UniProtKB/Swiss-Prot annotation:
Component of the ubiquinol-cytochrome c reductase complex (complex III or cytochrome b-c1 complex) that is part of the mitochondrial respiratory chain. The b-c1 complex mediates electron transfer from ubiquinol to cytochrome c. Contributes to the generation of a proton gradient across the mitochondrial membrane that is then used for ATP synthesis. The chain crosses the membrane at residues 33-53, 77-98, 113-133, 178-198, 226-246, 288-308, 320-340, 347-367. One of its GO terms (cellular component) is respiratory chain complex III. Heme 1 (or BL or b562) is low-potential and absorbs at about 562 nm, and heme 2 (or BH or b566) is high-potential and absorbs at about 566 nm. GO terms for molecular function: metal ion binding; ubiquinol-cytochrome-c reductase activity. Binds 2 heme b groups non-covalently. A ubiquinone binds at residue 201. The cytochrome bc1 complex contains 11 subunits: 3 respiratory subunits (MT-CYB, CYC1 and UQCRFS1), 2 core proteins (UQCRC1 and UQCRC2) and 6 low-molecular weight proteins (UQCRH/QCR6, UQCRB/QCR7, UQCRQ/QCR8, UQCR10/QCR9, UQCR11/QCR10 and a cleavage product of UQCRFS1). This cytochrome bc1 complex then forms a dimer. This is Cytochrome b. Its cofactor is heme b. Keywords: Electron transport, Heme, Iron, Membrane, Metal-binding, Mitochondrion, Mitochondrion inner membrane, Respiratory chain, Transmembrane, Transmembrane helix, Transport, Ubiquinone. Pfam families: Cytochrom_B_C, Cytochrome_B.
Length: 379
């Protein structure tokens, strides 16, 4: 078996990726989220597949087909809520994974980092389209508001929106194509994740100290397979508690009302994981400016390798930038809170200040603090 593991063309790839992979001996639990994201993806594809067997992508029957899944299909309620809350768990793991990458300087592996950001965009697109499928009030109005943002693009905006809608409003054609895209995108994400891993294994993993790890490496199996298993058990526990005790905790009650184009909900808001970007969008009074800020709030992550001014890779030994990092985390939590609030005083000004702080920390303060820390090193 050992020989086959190392000689068989297919097993050899698996062996070099998950068994004999040389891994830094010092990586902490923050490195568990890669495997957890893989599990999230598999879970979402499997639950999604079973939901697709019973779902109908027609405006007349979409809402009742979801009700049918929950009431009449064997364990349909469990599959539906695992899929809905699986998306929330996916984003929790994603945000922690990206945060770890920023904290420990993993963005210096530019190819891996950039493909990771493309993955983030793909997952966000998939989640948005998935939220439209139950065809509740928030599904319909969320789809209307977010797709309408494209009309801010000069010259081609209106045409682009009507092209995406497949008509002059969000209707049957929109729902059908969103279902088609929502079904195919996870497989594209899987392919991108493999490319992400391919580039990661070209350089090897980073480690908490940010120093060259080649001096001390251990095989991935059994050390990290066992370590990852603990993370998986914690993940499954949290997930099951969420699904079985409060499945609607992270959802919107408006989505239990069938979509009605004639009745606008008082507060249109996306799922919780988009609220920070939604708050940045709303903080700019101009439509095109808001859309640009929305896209840049994620695209700005691509600038991290270019904005790295420090001689040290990780934030482990950099107290000033460390402080800025945690201010950034709190700022993102404030933006998430603001995104769920109505557009009125004092939420407008808080959102604007938090948005300015978000871009300022990344573009101005972090590069400057890196240079200051370089000076301190010479003292």
């Amino acid at each position: 078996m050992t020989n086959m593991r190392k000689s068989h063309p297919l097993f050899k790839i698996i062996n070099h990726s998950f068994i004999d992979l040389p891994t830094p001996s010092s990586i902490s639990s923050w490195w568990n989220f890669g495997s957890l994201l893989g599990i999230c993806l598999v879970l979402q594809i499997l639950t999604g597949l079973f939901l697709a067997m019973h779902y109908t992508s027609d405006t007349m029957t979409a809402f009742s087909s979801v009700t049918h899944i929950c009431r009449d299909v064997n364990y349909g309620w469990l599959i539906r809520y695992m899929h809905a809350n699986g998306a929330s768990m996916f984003f929790i793991c994603l945000f922690l994974h990206v945060g770890r990458g920023i904290y420990y300087g993993s963005y210096m592996f530019t190819e891996t980092w950039n493909i990771g950001i493309i993955l983030l965009f793909a997952v966000m697109a998939t989640a948005f389209m998935g939220y439209v499928l139950p065809w509740g009030q928030m599904s319909f109005w969320g789809a209307t508001v977010i797709t309408n943002l494209l009309s801010a693009i000069p010259y081609i905006g209106t045409m682009l929106v009507e092209w995406i809608w497949g008509g002059f409003s969000v209707d049957k054609a929109t729902l059908t194509r969103f279902f088609a895209f929502h079904f195919i995108l996870p497989f594209i994400i899987t392919a991108l994740a493999m490319v992400h891993l391919l580039f990661l294994h070209e350089t090897g993993s980073n480690n908490p100290s940010g120093l060259d790890p080649n001096a001390d490496k251990i095989p991935f199996h059994p050390y990290y397979t066992i370590k990852d298993t603990l993370g998986v058990l914690i993940f499954i526990t949290v997930m099951l508690v969420l699904v079985l005790f409060s499945p609607d905790l992270l959802g919107d009650p408006d989505n239990y009302t069938p979509a009605n184009p004639l009745n606008t909900p008082p507060h249109i808001k996306p799922e919780w994981y988009f609220l920070f970007a939604y708050a940045i969008l709303r903080s700019i009074p101009n439509k095109l400016g808001g859309v640009m800020a929305l896209v840049l709030s994620i695209l700005i992550l691509m600038l991290f390798p270019l904005l790295h001014t420090s001689k040290q890779r990780s934030l482990m030994f950099r107290p000033i930038t460390q402080t800025l990092f945690w201010i950034l985390v709190v700022d993102l939590l404030i933006l998430t809170w603001i995104g769920g609030q109505p557009v009125e005083h004092p939420f407008i000004i808080i959102g604007q200040l938090a948005s300015i702080l978000y871009f300022s920390i990344i573009l101005i303060f972090m590069p400057i603090s890196g240079l200051i820390e370089n000076k301190i090193l010479k003292i």
